[in-house]
Amino acid sequence: MAGGGPTFSIELSAYGSDLPTDKASGDIPNEEGSGLSRVGSGIWSGRTVDYSSESSSSIGTPGDSEEEDEESEEDNDEEELGLASLRSLEDSLPSKGLSSHYKGKSKSFGNLGEIGSVKEVPKQENPLNKKRRLQIYNKLARKSFYSWQNPKSMPLLPVHEDNDDEEGDDGDLSDEERGGDVLARRPSFKNRALKSMSCFALSDLQEEEEEEEDE
């Protein structure tokens, strides 16, 4: 064109050719054929693609969880067996103790089913302990015998018969005989002279003179 003004031209063919190429390059068909996904957009169209592998997650494998369940079941079974054994033991034991059925010393049994006869129940006594117990019993019996007093026996009373006889005999004697006995009982001056001179007094001379006059 010949003219004075500038001319503008738009190449539509270039933009039109770019659009399908961008679409072709940006869109990637899904492996499963269910939809298209755009690279780098982070937005999924259609069904989501499963990126998880066939292996298990990082938390744990299914095989490990099954093994743990089996171990816990075994532990529970063992506990149940223990409780069952205790229950069976309680059922086998009598409701009352052995002491209410047997008087005396008995052996200690872990299981009453071990008793074959009644003769096995009493406890055997050591002969040395029996001898020692008898000796202690005899000593205590002797002490109690000597210290024991019969309450029915009457206490012994003092006898005064001899004194009564002497008083009766004195009543029968005359006054002269009594005087002779009194003189005989008095010690003579000669016997008293043998004593120390410090004991000599005038009263002794007077007594001697009286004795001479009586003679």
From Swiss-Prot:
GO CC entries: nucleus
Location of the region described as Disordered in the Swiss-Prot/TrEMBL record: 1-132, 150-183
Keywords, comma-separated and alphabetical: Activator, Nucleus, Phosphoprotein, Stress response, Transcription, Transcription regulation
Motif range (Nuclear localization signal): 129-137
Annotated site residue numbers, Critical for interaction with HDA19: S188
Effect upon mutating S188G: Impaired interaction with HDA19
PANTHER family: (RAPE) HYPOTHETICAL PROTEIN (PTHR33172:SF51), OS08G0516900 PROTEIN (PTHR33172)
Name of the protein: KID-containing protein 1
Organism: Brassica napus
Organism phylogeny: Eukaryota, Viridiplantae, Streptophyta, Embryophyta, Tracheophyta
